């Protein structure tokens, strides 16, 4: 096996994650040639419908899986948490890499602080029912000012798009996966020359806190990358097994199995 076609979504974060995988793979197999491919999914195209109201699971993954099944690529790099619980029998998640930080970040605009103190009310961008449920208690009990009323508003788009909507709008807070911010900040400056600068500029306008897992358990697989291959590609599965983090893989699988019981 001399060359691999690696598919991901088109967002900066998805491309960064694909290259993160590629770097790990090349450290083990330096003679491999890697070709990176991107594709927009239905979840990328429809930016108006809240994720919880979209018609099916896999809005960020099913279109990519079709490409894999049709042999237009060799493997796909996903965020584990985007994958539906049942991926079917034509493909499988072969491995995962070392899991990044699974916690969430809460950003609050500095210029919203006075308003929050005066009204005892805060508005927060989050499209995740899990986060909305968990943050109700966290925001009221852990922030350094009294909060009586919390308003959650849906938001869609990639990280920088959401950050810009947050900073330009009237909403006070914004919740996002810490792993996503970490990966963007650690991106190769040559490949993404403006990304880091823009993100640092956005963050400088905010106060932020890391939300403990004890009050805001993450979704199974948050922070972990899933490498999906065709189920019959035994040679690729064997090759990839050399870079699998078995402990993180088992942890994600266990968490997803618990969800299937509900």
Each language-model region and where it sits:
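Flexible hinge/capping segments at coil-to-helix
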Residues: 103-126, 140-145, 150
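Structural signal for conserved beta-strand scaffold positions within catalytic alpha/beta enzyme cores
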Residues: 38, 93-95, 108, 126, ...
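Residues embedded in well-ordered beta-strands
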Residues: 92, 105-107, 224-228
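Short beta-strand-centered segments that line the small-molecule binding cleft or hinge
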Residues: 61-105
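Flexible, charged surface loops at secondary-structure boundaries
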Residues: 1, 69, 116-121, 168
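Small-molecule-sensing regulatory modules
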Residues: 1-46, 53-54, 61, 80-86, ...
């Amino acid at each position: 096996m001399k060359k691999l076609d690696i598919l991901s979504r088109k967002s900066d974060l998805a491309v960064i994650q694909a290259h993160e995988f590629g770097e790990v793979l090349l450290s083990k197999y330096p003679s491999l040639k890697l070709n990176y491919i991107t594709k927009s999914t239905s979840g990328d195209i429809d930016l108006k419908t809240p994720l919880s109201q979209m018609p099916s699971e896999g809005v960020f993954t099913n279109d990519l899986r079709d490409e894999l099944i049709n042999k237009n690529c060799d493997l796909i790099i996903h965020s584990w948490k985007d994958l539906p619980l049942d991926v079917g029998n034509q493909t499988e998640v072969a491995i995962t890499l070392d899991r990044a930080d699974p916690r969430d970040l809460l950003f609050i605009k500095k210029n919203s602080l006075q308003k929050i103190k005066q009204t005892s009310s805060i508005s927060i961008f989050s499209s995740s029912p899990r986060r909305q449920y968990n943050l109700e208690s966290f925001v009221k009990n852990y922030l350094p000012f009294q909060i009586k009323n919390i308003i959650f508003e849906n938001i869609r788009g990639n990280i920088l798009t959401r950050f810009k909507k947050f900073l330009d709008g009237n909403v006070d807070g914004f919740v996002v996966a810490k792993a996503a911010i970490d990966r963007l900040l650690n991106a190769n400056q040559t490949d993404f020359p403006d990304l880091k600068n823009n993100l640092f500029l956005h963050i400088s306008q905010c106060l932020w806190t890391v939300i403990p897992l004890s009050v805001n358990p993450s979704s199974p697989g948050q922070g972990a990358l899933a490498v999906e291959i065709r189920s019959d590609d035994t040679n690729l599965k064997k090759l990839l097994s050399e870079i699998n983090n078995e402990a993180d893989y088992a942890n994600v699988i266990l968490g997803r199995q618990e969800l299937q019981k509900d």
